[in-house]
Amino acid sequence: MTENNDIKMVIITGMSGAGKTVALQSFEDLGYFCVDNLPPMLLPKFIELMADSKGKMNKVALGIDLRGREFFEHLWGALDDLSERTWIIPHILFLDAKDSTLVTRYKETRRSHPLAPTGLPLKGIEAERDLLTDMKARANIVLDTSDLKPKELREKIVHLFSTETEQAFRVNVMSFGFKYGIPIDADLVFDVRFLPNPYYIPHMKPLTGLDEEVSSYVLKFNETHKFLEKLTDLITFMLPHYKREGKSQLVIAIGCTGGQHRSVTLTEYLGKHLKPEYSVHVSHRDVEKRKGH
């Protein structure tokens, strides 16, 4: 392994109810390969798989909790082994919270503590805290989540573990055809079927909004300009608020009948408009289908 192939590994552990699920989701948003509840005895084998991935798994987050408590002796050995591998950059993130906070969270979710499935949550919390003493001592980072909302925990993790590029709010702008269905991952959907349709001009029928003749045709109409003015104003207003609420990306879908002409033209326009301020990815889901409107 060379420096360029170094693997960044984060082991997420801590008190049950302290936010490990939110933490794993946050790392997933940052592009980490995430595994929850990996038995420590499998960690050496997992490391071998990472080494063989040829850079495809260069950021990994592993969630370990008390469902694997009988394997803690294996964990200590695996952690010692990690320290000897110079091409792995290991971090242990320990999530903690006050006993009273954890009790409240268990009551709110009506779940049993894993160490007190039939008893009081506090008994399980006390036993777990004792069991995790050594793990907490070995942690690189300890986060107290007692006063953190899920969004605030995510923001802390993003701040601690992401690069400047990874912190960028990503905007995906895509065109689609309603005849093929609305994209299931779309956050915002705009219907532009009210605009004049180049499909009915014979020589434009086989073209798409990526062709200058089609885009010029769509953009020449007054209603197109008015719509784009209102659309860009709306999106420009909304994006900072979505970012503030903790979203890592926003998918904006613009649809026409077949996803060939109007939606493609406007998607290209919106993408270019947003790129100076945001990390933007433009895609055209149905542009290759060319099945007609």
Swiss-Prot record:
Gene3D superfamilies, A to Z: P-loop containing nucleotide triphosphate hydrolases
GO molecular function, one term: ATP binding
Entry keyword Metal-binding: no
InterPro entries tied to this protein: P-loop_NTPase, RapZ-like, RapZ-like_N, RapZ_C
Binding-site list for ATP: 14-21
Family matches, as HAMAP family: RapZ_like (MF_00636)
Record protein name field: Nucleotide-binding protein BCG9842_B5683
Source organism: Bacillus cereus (strain G9842)
Organism lineage string: Bacteria, Bacillati, Bacillota, Bacilli, Bacillales
